């Protein structure tokens, strides 16, 4: 399931963050890639301990935990702290898949990467290329979103970033460990939750059918969830 989550960051905060990141010190992105990914990765990355990066990352996490759409779609149990990348003209990232386990800096307990997230910070009209292309059984999905918007997708998906041909593309990227690791089960719960919300609006929260469906949702979550 691919999920577009609009306005994770307010427009003014996204603009402020972009200006701050443009003035930060960046390193070669290949330094943080695995052996296979390093062969196809051409970008810059903000060091994980960058003060401005940590500040913006914390705001992203706070914003997400206030968003019902994210909570319903991801069912998050752990979030790998957001990182930041920068693609200048000629930069891109070839086809690859994300590592199954990621270790936050200074932690020995890994995060299982059930979901990948990209939050765009550069307005789409300021650069050409730089599209996130995600492959699944339905084909290729090309993603280029407004500043402050985010896409959520299964971390096991093959994906790439097309070469930037004008301007630059700055974005946050990170991973989520979900209560429900199976993407199909998580998608069913997301659709069921949406149907319950629609029914509650139409019939009322206390309507018998709404209560019954809510019980089905929680019983499925109880069956499928693992902390």
From Swiss-Prot:
Q: Where does 2-oxoglutarate bind?
A: 169
Positions that bind Fe cation: 96, 98, 159
Known InterPro entries for this protein? Oxoglu/Fe-dep_dioxygenase_dom (IPR005123), PKHD_C (IPR041097), PKHD_hydroxylase (IPR023550), Pro_4_hyd_alph (IPR006620), Pro_4_hyd_alph_FE2OG_OXY (IPR044862), RmlC_Cupin_sf (IPR011051)
**Does Metal-binding appear among the keywords?**
yes
Q: Which cofactor does it need?
A: Fe(2+); L-ascorbate
Cofactor binding remark: Binds 1 Fe(2+) ion per subunit.
- Fe2OG dioxygenase domain location: 78-178
The enzyme's E.C. designation: 1.14.11.-
Q: Which PROSITE patterns match?
A: FE2OG_OXY (PS51471)
The GO terms this record gives for MF are:
2-oxoglutarate-dependent dioxygenase activity; iron ion binding; L-ascorbic acid binding
Q: Which keywords, in A-to-Z order, does the entry hold? A: Dioxygenase, Iron, Metal-binding, Oxidoreductase, Vitamin C
One of the GO biological process terms: DNA damage response
Q: What PANTHER family does the annotation carry?
A: PKHD-TYPE HYDROXYLASE YBIX (PTHR41536:SF1)
Q: HAMAP family this protein is in?
A: Hydroxyl_YbiX
> What's the protein called, per UniProt?
PKHD-type hydroxylase BAV1196
Name the species this protein comes from: Bordetella avium (strain 197N)
